[in-house]
Amino acid sequence: MIVDNSKDFDLKSFLANLTTHSGVYRMLDKHGEIIYVGKAKNLKNRVNSYFSKGAKDSKTLMMVEQIARIEITITPSDYEAYLLENNLIKQHRPKYNILFKDDKSYPYLVISRDKFPRVSFYRGKSAYKKGQCFGPYVSISSVKNTLNTIQKIFPIRQCENSYYKSRVRPCLQYQIKRCLAPCVGLVSQQQYDEQLAILKKFLAGKFSTVLEEISAKMYQASEDMEYEKAQVYRDQLVVLRKLQQQQIVDIQEDKTFDVIGIYMQDSYASIALLQIQNGDVVADRHWSIDAKGQDKTSIMHAFLSHFYLGDEIRNIWPKNIILSKVEFADITDLMNSISQKIGQAINWIIAPAADNLKWLKLAEVNARQKLNIYTSSKSQYQKRLESLKEFLELEKDIKRIECFDISHFQGEATIASCVVYTDEGEDRKSHRRYNIKDIKAGDDYAAIYQAVSRRVSSGLEADNLPDVMIIDGGKGQIHQAEAVFREFGIQDKVQLVSLGKGVERISGKEKIYKGFDDTEYTLDEHNPGFLLLRQVRDSAHDHAIKGQRKKVSANRQSSIIEEIEGVGPKRRKALIMYFGGWQELSRASVDEIAKVKGISKKLAQEIWECFH
């Protein structure tokens, strides 16, 4: 139950009547924002401790001064309390909690839940919603290489469901023996599931088991005189043997473990997680945080809860977890909750012997190195922010910067990009692109006006306007943004600035204009504020170019067919649904093209001539 959600909050009465049950508590400020989330075995004792006379660190004292209301949720057990606490922290990201931000969103291989499943990859932890996950992989290139390897060995489909459902004949993948063509019923459910089961064992690292099973199936097929089937198994074995020579080994679960090292310096902390399989580091991940007022114990405790009680996906969980030496007041409760969450017992090693000590030292060295990089980069970035604030003569610190850039191809396929930087650095998840419509070809001014209008309109509605908005361009571009600002009345809410290369178009000699100020400014090319302006501008430019290229590519795909009189949208769709793509259409004969509904022999001849 949630307790006390009223504006007239009586702290003294609330503390006196608190329950002694386990649960989660939330501290809210006068604006109703959650500033801290905590978990307790005894809510009464834990919440009252914040208001007792005992010694407290400066961060806790600062937080207590801001508490305007407290809410609690009673849970049936400690386990549910841990899970709820973790979910609330991720949802609200309270400023006084220890917050972890993964250094990247890792890709996973996913086997879908379809009747004839497909294998594909997804980035991020939402992958588990798509099907059975394997990973995470350390990079996009590694997961793509694995997909390519899978396709050579296991004829499991990788196509999108929309493509799969539209097939009326096998695609090229079937012809080169990389798919069993379940789309047109050329394989039974049993045969497909058999290949799928072997693939899952392969992805789980059961390499020897896979070799044994395929060998047995090959010999059985040969004895049954099913020679084509035996040849398929033989071809699989050939590729697998080559992989074996490249040192792919079995994953032995008793030799699979995680190592977690922590390093602290000043008010910062870094955690390194090494994932070990058969004596090899298969993945290393890092988290660096601001940890003012925290100690190693509280940081490690928060990390274990964040990582192991969160939505991390692992097809093999470690049986051993090695930790930096820290003291836990309720380590047993946390360990039990983690074991319950992942469904197996874990051996926690806090003081490792010589065999495992080397791994812990390696993790701690990694944590230290990452923290040095993090603090150095953060310090440099803060200097740039402060320098830009000084140049723009702003009273408040800069918390959010947005930059707009326009890209088009010969006046067509116009894209506006908007990149976001916060006081923590680049915020890639907030980047976005705008498709620009209903303007004259190549009209950058109109494109800027449209993009900024759409952003300001949504920003006012969501109350998330930036502190600084940068426009890539000169006087003409910034005047368009100024017109939008006047229209919405936000001249005093957002600092507008533009960065253009000027007549000379020399990098480092850019001309700067402030909003509603026609003065032309220049800064030394080594000025920290100028470097930040260029950094953000270049990021926006790259983001725009990538979006524009995608749009041009999409527009070109059907341009060849569009030139043929008599082939409209319906017939183009029919052609794609029948052949599965332009490439396969280009290989088709006139007679094959004429089989498509609505395509006459004469029209089929014209289409064929387009590609030949």
Curated annotation (Swiss-Prot):
GO terms for molecular function: DNA binding; excinuclease ABC activity. Gene3D superfamilies: 5' to 3' exonuclease, C-terminal subdomain, GIY-YIG endonuclease, UVR domain, UvrC, RNAse H endonuclease domain. The keyword Cytoplasm applies. InterPro entries: GIY-YIG_endonuc, GIY-YIG_endonuc_sf, GIY-YIG_UvrC_Cho, RuvA_2-like, UVR_dom, UVR_dom_sf, UvrABC_protein_C, UvrC. Pfam families: GIY-YIG (PF01541), HHH_5 (PF14520), UVR (PF02151), UvrC_RNaseH (PF22920), UvrC_RNaseH_dom (PF08459). Belongs to the UvrC family. Keywords: Cytoplasm, DNA damage, DNA excision, DNA repair, Excision nuclease, SOS response. The keyword DNA damage applies. The gene is uvrC. One of its GO terms (biological process) is nucleotide-excision repair. The UvrABC repair system catalyzes the recognition and processing of DNA lesions. UvrC both incises the 5' and 3' sides of the lesion. The N-terminal half is responsible for the 3' incision and the C-terminal half is responsible for the 5' incision. GO terms for cellular component: cytoplasm; excinuclease repair complex. This is UvrABC system protein C. Residues 208-243 form the UVR domain. It comes from Francisella tularensis subsp. novicida (strain U112). Interacts with UvrB in an incision complex. Signal peptide: none annotated. CDD domains: GIY-YIG_UvrC_Cho. It is found in: Cytoplasm.
